[in-house]
């Protein structure tokens, strides 16, 4: 599109260098998406169906699983479209809406993970006070606050983005409407908006990462004070899954977004985005359940109850 022409739509390039692999990639990503929905949905259903799992840790895990379902759903359907048609077009309002929900859910996810770290800290470092501090009311307030803060931060950024006139190149070298590539189509200088975006990113990502690190420093200190090696292993196993998810998510996102994105190369970012958008939400249910005896026991109970009832 010529410069000076007002843009009403964007063209998503997706992965143009993988000609001939569209069909197998479509099938692989579609199956991954279905497994992600099923895995995270099963976590939510299991927690709500099993009274023993209705404690703060699993309440926040349900929030995380719901966010993972929503996070992948904001991107994967359009990504699949790039494998089907040669020219994937998305209208301006749809593009901005996709960007809003994608970053809103992603921001909220960081905040929920931070609350989960705090819950792990209380469980291990202050086990006697944990039940009186992490009440159902406080859990609900913390989760709701995460959603509200995530919404507010991204909504303010989106409102600024909507005000921009777009008249440059409307081709986005990505598989979804990322903010960085979209800014390259703006008719005016976007340095201030980029700076505000970096500030918001620093507040959310490194800010929450610092809180997570402090929580785990206290947790590891408490674990090291346990006299027996068996106690070390048993206590650490209760937070190992959460630490794994935190490492995966923060590692990918810190690499992608802690730069002024409008002037960066997005080729490597696209690969990391695929891992962050597709694989991490798929792996989370397995990471949280593979060493969790309570969840595995609840799943086993859910699968065997119908058979028992039928035998009677």
From Swiss-Prot:
Purpose: Odorant receptor.
Source species: Homo sapiens
Disulfide bond listed as a keyword: yes
GO cellular component terms, semicolon-separated: plasma membrane
GN (gene name): OR6X1
Gene Ontology molecular function terms on file: G protein-coupled receptor activity; olfactory receptor activity
Pfam families from the UniProt entry: 7tm_4 (PF13853)
Protein name: Olfactory receptor 6X1
Subcellular location: Cell membrane
Keywords: Cell membrane, Disulfide bond, G-protein coupled receptor, Glycoprotein, Membrane, Olfaction, Receptor, Sensory transduction, Transducer, Transmembrane, Transmembrane helix
PROSITE patterns according to UniProt: G_PROTEIN_RECEP_F1_1 (PS00237), G_PROTEIN_RECEP_F1_2 (PS50262)
Sites where a glycan is attached: 3
InterPro entries xref list: GPCR_Rhodpsn (IPR000276), GPCR_Rhodpsn_7TM (IPR017452), Olfact_rcpt (IPR000725), Olfact_rcpt_6C-like (IPR047132)
Membrane topology qualifier: Multi-pass membrane protein
Protein family according to the UniProt entry: Belongs to the G-protein coupled receptor 1 family.
Tree of life domain: Eukaryota
């Amino acid at each position: 599109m010529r410069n000076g022409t007002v843009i009403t739509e964007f063209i998503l390039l997706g992965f143009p260098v993988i000609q001939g692999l569209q069909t197998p990639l479509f099938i692989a990503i579609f199956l991954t998406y279905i497994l992600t929905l099923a895995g995270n949905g099963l976590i939510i259903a299991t927690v709500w169906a099993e009274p023993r799992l209705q404690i703060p840790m699993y309440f926040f895990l349900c929030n995380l699983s719901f966010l993972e379902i929503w996070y992948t759903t904001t991107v994967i359907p359009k990504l699949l479209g790039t494998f089907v048609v040669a020219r994937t077009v998305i209208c301006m309002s749809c593009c901005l809406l996709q960007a809003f929900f994608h970053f809103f859910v992603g921001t909220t996810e960081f905040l929920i993970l931070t609350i989960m770290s705090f819950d792990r800290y209380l469980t291990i470092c202050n086990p006697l006070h944990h039940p009186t501090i992490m009440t159902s009311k406080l859990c609900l307030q913390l989760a709701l606050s995460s959603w509200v803060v995530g919404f507010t931060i991204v909504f303010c950024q989106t409102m600024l983005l909507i005000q921009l006139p777009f008249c440059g190149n409307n081709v986005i070298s990505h598989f979804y409407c990322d903010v960085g590539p979209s800014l390259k189509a703006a008719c005016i200088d976007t340095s201030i908006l980029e700076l505000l975006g970096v500030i918001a990113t620093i507040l959310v990502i490194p800010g929450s990462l610092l809180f997570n690190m402090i929580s785990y420093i206290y947790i590891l200190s408490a674990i090291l004070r346990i006299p027996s090696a068996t106690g070390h292993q048993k206590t650490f196993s209760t937070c190992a899954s959460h630490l794994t998810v935190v490492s995966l998510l923060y590692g990918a996102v810190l690499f992608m977004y802690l730069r002024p994105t409008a002037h960066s190369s997005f080729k490597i970012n696209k690969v990391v985005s695929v891992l962050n958008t597709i694989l991490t939400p798929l792996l989370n249910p397995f990471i949280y359940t593979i060493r969790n005896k309570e969840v595995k026991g609840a799943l086993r109970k859910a699968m065997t109850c119908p058979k028992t009832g039928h035998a009677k």
